[in-house]
Swiss-Prot record:
Protein name stated in the entry: Transcription factor WRKY45-2
Gene encoding the protein: WRKY45-2
Native organism taxonomy: Eukaryota, Viridiplantae, Streptophyta, Embryophyta, Tracheophyta
Subcellular location: Nucleus
Keywords: Activator, DNA-binding, Nucleus, Plant defense, Stress response, Transcription, Transcription regulation
Family of this protein: Belongs to the WRKY group III family.
């Protein structure tokens, strides 16, 4: 009875397709006649769209009906059957193919059966799912260092149905992360300043005030006390700067013929400090205003305060009147 009724759908399908094509052509002619009416044109567009959608659906149904039997047999061979020779599967062919694809994707990882889930890696659970025809759910884990070290390793854990004490673990991807607890410790060691050395400058090749920091994985060797009698515990790195040269001033300054003055004085000083050499100075050559800001002329200031009998009033110096 089935064989006598099987050719029937072919003429019916052809008749339906012919009628749909004719209706579509008539709607197109109507669209040409109603071109000047925007409202009528919109209705005709909807009619044409409906015809086109119905024809596509009819084509898809005909292809599914023609290849349904062959698809069912191929699905039974590929995925493993469970249906009898005289019966058919209740699930659609599309669902069976999707199930086969899911099984193939799940088996792409490395699956092991273990008693203990501790594998020495850091995992974070991000989901759990009930599995069809299984007594226990499946848990999904990702590496803890997914976001800070971009590690894409994953694992799926499910308790075995036949042995509840065992777990079926599927590993997907490889660990590219590094545990911070086992990473080598980088220590910063300060090379102490050497007070005396064998170099010509007497500083062991280092400028005054310079510091060097080296980053090594091993502990630093102990510093010999004899080689470095003077050490510094300041760990701030300072760039070596120019050495300060003494300024020699010649002329009558008390009983001393020469006096060394640092050259890093304020710009408000006299030409003697800028030039480096000056003649004798008298008390009237002292810059009183600059002396209030500690930028007075060194030579004149020393000559001025040399006389113990000098008495001055602070108000007179400031030039203030109350």
């Amino acid at each position: 009875m089935t064989s006598s009724m099987s050719p029937a759908p072919a003429p019916a399908y052809a008749q339906v397709m012919e009628d749909m094509e004719k209706g579509k052509e008539l709607a197109a002619q109507l669209q040409g006649l109603l071109r000047d009416s925007p409202e009528a044109g919109r209705f005709v567009d909807q009619i044409l769209h409906t015809f086109s959608r119905a024809m596509r659906a009819l084509d898809k149904a005909a292809v599914s009906a023609a290849g349904g039997e062959g698809s069912e047999v191929q699905s039974e061979v590929t995925c493993g059957g469970g249906a009898s020779a005289g019966g058919k599967r209740k699930a659609p062919a599309a669902n069976r193919k999707a199930n086969c694809r899911r099984r193939t994707q799940q088996s792409s990882g490395n699956t092991v059966v273990v008693k203990n889930l501790d594998d020495g890696q850091a995992w974070r659970k991000y989901g759990q799912k009930e599995i069809q025809n299984s007594k226990h759910p499946k848990a999904y884990f990702r590496c803890t260092h997914k976001y800070d070290q971009m590690c894409t390793a994953q694992r799926q854990v499910q308790r075995c149905d036949d042995d509840p004490a065992s777990y079926r673990v599927t590993y997907i991807g490889e660990h590219t992360c590094r545990d911070p607890a086992t990473a080598p410790i980088i220590a910063a060691h300060v090379i102490h300043q050497v007070a005396a050395g064998d170099d010509d400058d007497g500083c062991g090749g280092l400028h005054a005030g310079s510091r060097l920091i080296s980053f090594v994985a091993a502990p630093a060797a102990p510093v010999d006390a004899a080689a470095a009698p003077t050490t510094s515990t300041i760990t701030t790195v300072t760039a070596p700067g120019p050495l300060l040269q003494p300024l020699k001033v010649e002329g009558g300054i008390g009983s001393s013929d020469q006096e060394e003055v640092l050259s890093s004085l304020t710009p408000g000083s006299s030409a003697a400090r800028g030039g480096g050499v000056a003649g004798p100075f008298g008390p009237d050559q002292g810059d009183v205003t600059s002396s209030l800001h500690w930028s007075y002329d060194a030579v004149a200031g020393m000559e001025f305060f040399k006389n113990d009998e000098v008495v001055f009033d602070l108000d007179d110096i400031m030039g203030l009147s109350f």
